[in-house]
Amino acid sequence: MKDCSEKFLVIGAGPVGLATAKAFNDAEIAYDQVDADTDIGGNWKHGVYRSAHIISSKHTTEYADFPMPEDYPDFPSRQQMLAYLNSYADAFYLRENIEFSTKVVMITPRANEFYEVEFASGEKRVYKGVAVGSGHHWQKRFPDYEGEFAGEYFHSKDYKSPEQLADKRVLVIGGGNSACDIASEAARVGKSCHLSLRRGYWFLPKTLFGKPTAESFMRYFPVAIQRFFIKAALRVVLGKYEDYGLPKPDHKIFQKHPTLNSELLHYLKHGRIKPRPDVKKFEGKTVHFVDGASDIFDAVVCGTGFYVSFPFLPEGVVKVKNGNLAMVYAGCVLEKHKNLYILGTTQPRYGFGPLVTPSSQMLAQIIKLQDEMELPIGLVMKHSGVKLPDSHLVDPIFALRQMKIAKYTLPLLLRKEKKLRKKHAEKVNSKENVMFQPNSDMQVY
């Protein structure tokens, strides 16, 4: 077994993994970096379709310390995003430290607070800590319906090109960004396209008044004010969703991730996409809907999202709520495990750019502080009143402000940690001839 106990392991070479590696270099934190794929890019390398473009904008997606090229359009393509991520890695000399085609299959916390990491090759190494930046766009979430569909049935992650839809009767299930992109492509190349929605969504155009919607000046205002003005703008620009045959949204805007797509409503009005309610059951190639209607399809595409899960970690190490919300403090910190960090499981309302660099810098600061503590810093955060997340959707402006404050407040956790240790030491000393057994709240790994 290879001894890497003075290093961290960074898992993933996508946007988050690369930013983490740069932050570790800047903070002089020794690390190795691995990725299961053959090159840089993460989800942009293996998980998106050939015609994909970002839905936010280049200025809300670019790294804070590495702007995108000036000649990039407002909504760069998959190929441009890959080129950008590669240029970021090369500019900061990150590539030379990445081991590609190296898949992690198990991470085991050891009693001495190190981590045993096993790879698909069978190799094992011991690390001081692990930063998991492998993303959450890989365990597909499929809907559960009665019966089986006899035609082509696949997840949006397995969609790569319009040829998969050409001259076919296509049903797309879901109203998120990928589902609506695929429905729009099916409207262009398919024989027909239907879109099944279980609930109402907020559909926003990618631009408002000539500017990317994600770059609206309104993002600096409180959410209540943003909601008021965006709803007013949508009423002027789009009208009512019911006029397109769509159900009304069943939630306030930004309570769930809005869908940014400028083509969906266009194709609905042109009759190239037909809105449908939720599916009731499959019967051969016939799909029955909850309103009693039915139709025959050649292909069903499920744009129904992903589960957040960590199969390479022992069960219970990371608690996940509702299948999509990792219970971590400060966006990455576990309560009971020192130096095991879970990155990138939240979803900004728009591009990752404003958050990924400062959050990686904050992680480096947290690691430095953990070195000065005996207790897990997550446990100290818990006793300091830091809250667990209640939604996977993050307001980037609010989160950025919080990280700026955290730069100065995090060191105060050292004092809190000393008080916690003293408190429990007093409990030990108060019990003569009885060995202190830590309660479940104080067990560390």
Predicted regions and their residues:
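N-terminal glycine-rich dinucleotide-binding loop that anchors FAD/FMN and/or NAD(P) in oxidoreductases
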Residues: 47-70, 213-229
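Helix-loop-beta segment of a Rossmann-like dinucleotide-binding subdomain
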Residues: 62-78, 116, 166-167, 244-255
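Feature captures the FAD/FMN-dependent oxidoreductase FAD-binding
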Residues: 74-138, 267-271, 281-286
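Short loop/edge segments at beta-strand edges and connector loops
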Residues: 100-102, 155, 197, 275-277, ...
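C-terminal catalytic lobe of FAD-dependent flavoproteins
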Residues: 247-318, 389-445
